[in-house]
Amino acid sequence: MKKYAFLFMIMIIGLLSCGDDDKPVVPKLDKLSQVICSEGTDVIFFTYINYTSDDKIASIDFVKGNKIPFIYVDKMITMMNPEDGIERIEYNMQGSVIIDKSVKKDNPYNKEVYISDRYDYTYTGSSLIGASRIMKWPKEKGGYESQTFDKEETYSWENGNIILFTQDKKRIEYKYSTDLTPSNFPWRVIPSFRPVGFDIVSPVNLLYGNPSRNLPESATFYSLSEDDDTTASYKYHFTTTGDYITSMTIEEQIYSGEQAAEQHTYNYLFTYSK
């Protein structure tokens, strides 16, 4: 009996070992390395994204545009000369998320570099829910003036998705499909009421905590102000190849009063690399 009991135990251990070996391994997806956005036959931007050996963003290079290097020192990421008029943008990290951002510009009166905009981000867990902003501008005779916005950005979540972004009296609502957002696809609800352009798919978006769980289906912009009758609608279409989103189309319609709708169709192509 002892012999059979021993053999039975060996069989159980073997089965448990096989169970551990059979656990599915989630493959690491390649990183977004190229984005091309066009409208009709016109290329709006063509961007290469380069990475360091430890998978950090090394630079974002726009063909016929800025080449933007990233510098890493301790918990700070610095984006150099991201656009005309901005000397650099500094991001402070806590763990894997951005907790504040400082936009630095040159003072035209004394050439001093100053913080023109400071954003402090608020999270619930790893989900971004809001940001405050301190805006500063130089005075011709010296010194600075500033203004604080406690609720510069507000994000509302439902079922793992950002369904509403608000700023003052402006609103943009999002609806989602049942398709899941791949972990390497950096689309994000950005603080904009015209969500087109490179910023919606910048890899920096992956540093703002949880992305929306699902891919967007549509978005609608409107204002609660009686002085602003502009509305806009956006429809999203995605093409997937295996685990990767290889293209995205955004159909934009902008309405203002009784004028005919302004229509645009933006086509994005995505390339990935290890």
Regions found by a protein language model. Give the residues of each.
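Buried hydrophobic residues that stabilize the cores of well-folded domains
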Residues: 20-274
